[in-house]
Amino acid sequence: MIRRPPRSTPLYSSAASDVYKRQELDDTLLMPKVAEILSQENVVGWFQGRMEFGPRALGARSIIGDPRSKKMQSVMNLKIKYRESFRPFAPSVLIEDVQNYFEFDRGSPYMLMVAPVSDQIRTPMTSDEEELFGIDKLNVVRSKLPSITHVDYSARIQTVHSQTNPRYHALISSFKEQTGCGVLINTSFNVRGEPIVCAPEDAYRCFMRTEMDYLVIENFLLHKSDQAKVVSDESWMNEFELD
């Protein structure tokens, strides 16, 4: 019997993922493998432990990607979240690296604080880019991390701490080891209008209904191409109105 602290969310056993085609890896193999997958501009559903209780996904029920990619913001919006392509995403950054990327010198573990992107990673707009209008101007690359940089050079930051979020911290650390970047895109594990996923079956359903490339449930890695085909039923996309 699995016991949980009072007022906690459920914790699911590994048996919950037994019905899916997946590869089981220990942390020493899983973290670098997922980091490599992310560095190749794949989108990953990340399901770990108990779900968050609050307004933001914090690395337990998250969809994650590479913030250095110029196309990742559009891809994650249009193909996963099913919303406007210009909607910005938030960064998860190692607490020890936060000042390397943002004008911010403290913790923000709940993704509630907004700060400017550091001058050292900003990309100045050219005179031609300044003349652009509307969506064309919104799509201008503004920093070395374009997928998490808002039009005003701000970002809503989540700092990730090894003591309180060890597995997510280990993943970002592995990504940094491979790429030199201690930041990931982090958005909630759901599509537009739906609640955040709770159970493994919720995560799998969202994974199969969207164009996510990989799903990680605890130590199990699932590739979309390995899964049984799902009969397409796009009526679910019409159940929720645009935000």
Q: Which sequence ranges carry the predicted segments?
A:
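Single conserved hydrophobic/aromatic residue that forms the stacking wall/gate
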Residues: 1-16, 20
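Flexible beta->alpha loop and helix N-cap segments adjacent to enzyme active/binding sites
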Residues: 14-243
